[in-house]
Amino acid sequence: MSQNLTPKLILPGFFLLLLSSLVPIAQAQKTTWRQATDAELASLLPARAPVEKEHIETEMRTASGIVNSHGHFIAGVVLLTAGYSAEGKYSHYLIVQTPVRIGGVALKPGEYVFGWTRAQAGDALSVHFHQAATGAQVGTAVAHLIAGTSRVESLHIWPPADKALIQIGRFSIPYELGEK
């Protein structure tokens, strides 16, 4: 009797062992995102951002970003453009280390700058994204007024599990993470 049970128990046992060894692999492939710390942002974002042919000072206290479990960031900071040729053209510097679509604008890993103009009605911003090195425009997205009362922030990049929004003042643009 025990000889007949052995093959019947070994095969299912082996199958369960194989499945249990694959579970950690599947869990490891799921990427989680969290808010980046001030120290992480300070080590990632430059004190002077390379924008076209200039190095424009950044205001680190406005830095915001997210980081995934693989150490890839999406982070930005306000540019201090007074006195530079970028004045009135760009307001923020953005580093993207994983593909992302911001309000319909697809951004590959790289460095970008963006600026905005307010809609005539005042309820939206037209946000234009440019490559930081060349100034070439990548696309334009619309940031909408955040409904209700919210904290006004120069820049806040929310983790996707919370809101999947990039907040600029009282306005926000939704984003979607892409695959690398």
What are these regions (language model features)?
Residues 108-117:
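A short tyrosine-centered beta-strand micro-motif
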Residues 91-101:
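Conserved interaction-surface patches within small, structured recognition/assembly domains
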Residues 1-7:
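N-terminal secretory signal peptides that target proteins for export/translocation
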Residues 26-85, 133-180:
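Primarily secretory-pathway and cell-envelope proteins
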Residues 116-137, 144:
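Compact nucleic-acid interaction/catalytic patches
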Residues 12-21:
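Bacterial N-terminal signal peptides
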Residues 72-74, 87-91, 107-109, 122-124:
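Extracytoplasmic
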